[in-house]
Structure formats: structure tokens, C-alpha cells
Amino acid sequence: MSKVNVNKVVVAYSGGLDTSVIIPWLKENYDCEVVAFVADVGQGAEELEGIEAKAKASGASECYIADLKEEMVADYIFPTLKTGAYYEGKYLLGTSMARPIIAKAQVEVARKVGADALCHGCTGKGNDQVRFEGAFAALAPDLHVIAPWREWDLVSREECLDYLAERNIPCSASLTKIYSRDANAWHISTEGGVLEDTWNAPNEDCWAWTVDPEQAPNEAETVTLKVAKGEIVEVDGEAMTPYNALVYLNEKGAKHGVGRIDIVENRLVGMKSRGCYETPGGTIMMEALRAVEQLVLDKASFEFREELGLKASHLVYDGRWFTPLCKSILAASEELAQDVNGEVVVKLYKGQATVTQKRSDNSLYSEEFATFGEDEVYDQSHAEGFIRLYSLSSRIRALNSQKK
């Protein structure tokens, strides 16, 4: 494929080996100015330390750092939580939810500096290339997109390190990298290494955040969450922003080994991959929201929310955040969440987050009607007519069979 003419490109920069190579490679192969863009999505202070200097040492003319933590949790994670989305029944979409806001902010920087191209460091095997480029297509269809991993002939970490050494570009990366990790305020994912063989149990170093449940405290701890319109607004009696609530619950959950999963998932590009994911605070939040939903959503609404969650999980995973369908699902979930108000107590113990108490002013649960003892509010004889109508089609089908 022939290269397009590019004057200025904004690259999503992490400070790692791949993107450190990408900056000089872009300058050499596209003869263009390179602007680095760094998204702070809660990956940690260590990852961001000195990152502007690293980018410029690699050849970037400028480096923009955007603090996206609050916006990511409030405008991307919380709306997704309201849908009840779990990808393939387990994954709380930690990497997937971070990509659209990173891409959006990258486009904003490109507009600000007058760039005519965008660049990402995703490989040609993974989901992220689709997520980034899908977002770019929706937000900036006029900008060129460069994906070096689909163009260059570098195939190993050793070759990447040699590339930088030949150009006297400093890099702290080592030749040996056991795992591939992605981190943000919501989760940490770990892939590769021993995990590539599904018969290998995860080593303890596969987990970067949470305490081994077997080594977690022997005494349970409880947290109390207040929910308003499907969002966590207060934890343990203190009003908190979405991000601060997540940080607080992450600390509590990680201490007790909450939020670990080991999953083999179907990637968008067709292959399967295995990963160990840690989502301590998110797991607690999801348990609390589901508990309130059990109280306030009627049967039809709950079933519909389940359907929304399934569809939303695939849309978010597949990089279709900026689509009319995703927007519609989020809007429907927002409407269903209007009555999702209440208070929940969650017990944290040895890797488990268990709801032990829940209440809501909007609750459809009535102790008077639900009692298994004697009551005066429900005439059980009324059930007979309902059952005859409810089973009418089965009765007619059986009668037809008897006539044959």
C-alpha cells in the first residue's frame, strides 16, 4: 500500500517500547511532524512519570497529556454499568470502555494542532485497532490513520530495542517481557506468558492488583453504597464523584481479593485469547446495582435490561460506541435506571463481594405479599383463573394431539 502524504500526525503515546519506536519511525517513513498524545485514564503515576520528556526524546515536537479519569468513569463506565453489560458473561469491559474516550481526546488534540493524521500502536491481531479506527471513522473521517504494526517489518522486542539504540533514543524497556498488560482506573488485564497455554493455572504474578483471596484478611469487611438513578453516589456515608467512588472501592476490593477472573474470550478479529482481569471496585459496583434492580424493576423491565446488557457488551467490546444503536441502548438503559434508587450493603471476604442487605423507596417487593406465612392481602384462589389462561395454549395443543 502506498503511503499517504502527511504533514503532522498525532500518535497515541504510552511511553512503552512500541510507541517509543513509532515516533522516530513516523518521522523517517512519512517525513512528518509527530505530536504525542497521552491519555491519563488512571493507569498509575509510575506510568506517567517523565512521559513528556520521553516523548520528546523519541522525537515528538510536542506532548499533550489529558486527564480523562473523571470523564471516563462518569460518561463511559457508569452508562455502560447501567446496561448491565458483561462480555461473554464475565468480562466487565475494562479495556473496551477506555478506548472510545482516548480516541475522542486524541481527535480533539489533532484538531487543536492542525494535524492531518492519527496514529495508534495497536497490533494487527487485536481488538484495539478496530476500536480506535472505528472511533476515528465516526469522529474524524477526514483524517488519515496510520497503523505502524500493519506496515513495518519489525517483528520482535529485540528488533525494536535495536531500532532505538541505533538512533541513540533512550528506552527503559527490557528485552524480556513476560506479560502484556493494560491498566486503567477500572481494571488491569494480563495476557501472554504462561497464560497462552490454557492448561496452565495462572501464576501469582499474573495478578498485578488484587490480593490472593486465600491470603486476604480472615475477617470480612462491609461497604455501604447509595444508588441514585443507577449510579453510585455515596459510599460508606460519604458523597463521592464517580471516579472517587471507584478509587475507594478499588482499594477495598483489592484488599480482599475481589474482582479476579480468568477468561478465554472471543476476539472481534476471530481468534480466541486468554486473559486474567482484575476489576475490584467495578465488581462491587455491579453487585450493588443489580441488587437494587432486583427490588425495583418489574419482570418485563428486568428481562429487557438483560437484553440491553447483552447487546451493549458486544457493541462496546467491538468498538461501536459512537454508533446510533449504542446511543439508543444507553438511552434506554438511562430511562430504566430512573427508579434504580436505594442502599446496599456488600460483604467483602476472600475474593467474594456478596450483597447482604438492600432497600429502596421504589421497591416493588412487598413483605405482606411475599410472606410464606398466613396473610390477608392475597387471595390465593385468584391464581386459578390466571393459570388456566396462562396455560391455555398448552391445553389446546394437548387436546389437538389427542384428536389424532
From Swiss-Prot:
Which Gene3D superfamilies does the record match to this protein? Argininosuccinate synthetase, chain A, domain 2, HUPs, Single helix bin
Listed name of the protein: Argininosuccinate synthase
Q: Where does the record say this protein resides?
A: Cytoplasm
Q: Which UniProt keywords apply?
A: Amino-acid biosynthesis, Arginine biosynthesis, ATP-binding, Cytoplasm, Ligase, Nucleotide-binding
- Keyword DNA repair in annotation: no
Write out the transmembrane intervals. Answer: none
Binding-site residues for L-citrulline, renumbered to this chain? 91, 96, 127, 131, 180, 189, 265, 277
Q: Pfam families attached here?
A: Arginosuc_syn_C, Arginosuc_synth
* Cellular component terms (Gene Ontology): cytoplasm
Q: Which reaction does it catalyse?
A: L-citrulline + L-aspartate + ATP = 2-(N(omega)-L-arginino)succinate + AMP + diphosphate + H(+)
Q: In which pathway does it act?
A: Amino-acid biosynthesis; L-arginine biosynthesis; L-arginine from L-ornithine and carbamoyl phosphate: step 2/3
Q: Does the keyword Nucleus apply?
A: no
Q: Name one GO biological process term.
A: argininosuccinate metabolic process
